[in-house]
Amino acid sequence: MTDNKYIIQIYGNITNNTVFYNKNIYVINGEVHVLSGVSLTIQNDTIIYIKNGKFTLSSLNKSALIFDNGSSLYANTVYFIACDKLNRRSIIPDNAGVWFCGTLEAQKETIKTNYGTQPSYFYARKIYAYYLGSTDPVKQKNSNLEPSTDNDGITILGCNNDEFKIQFLHVEQSGDNAIDIVQSYVTINNIVVLNPSEDALNIVSSSLTVVNTLILDVSLTNVYDRDIFDIEVDYGSSFIKINKYCYVEIKGIFGDQTTLVSNDLPQPTEGLYLYKGVTRNGQSYIYRNAIFNEEDD
């Protein structure tokens, strides 16, 4: 037991409709998939650990909870937290995070989604994620070494608005990018990202609409190429829309090769970008067009 809760180890895929109870702490060991057609229901305030370390049987080489396309999540408030090999909470991100896979055609690393399969459905009122993902130790400023694969905290892959219904997403101290949205179009009411190892929001040929709250704190560290927004156009244009009357709090380097259209947010400069306020004068857009797909340095 820990935190007065029983430890339940999860080693294999979730193949039947399952309930996670808040009297337990569930530990994800290796690559655990919630299979297509299967629903995972999580009681309010349940804690789920993602175990750190190398797992050779995982296609990602680390632990991850992956909701396959066609699977379902039903939750109120849930906590995803990194843990060590002794099932203790860890402040070192060394895992592959949590993945939500929809039914739009998409691929990231070894994980694919397929168009035309049973729709996914992911609902949670609040998700808190701490120390998810992993960072390459050589990816430091002025390093001449080539970084190897790293892992993001939360990945949204091939999802549409009908599939992704997470209302509040809080990601703190992620190992790589905090939230990676790939070939998706989703709306999230509230987003909070605090001190990711790299970018706060990585948007790859996707659209993201933020409705009520957008708080992104990417304080300066010795890691190079670390931005508030990393907008990529590998498979088509990408943009972020911030709705009118959204509370916005941004700190960090804005991000290159992006365009900001806003009557509220000031235009980014080369240095530290700071903004705190409400978008009272209309919607704001941050985008990059595929036609301008320059190769990154």
Regions found by a protein language model. Give the residues of each.
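Extracellular beta-rich repeat passengers
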Residues: 1-297
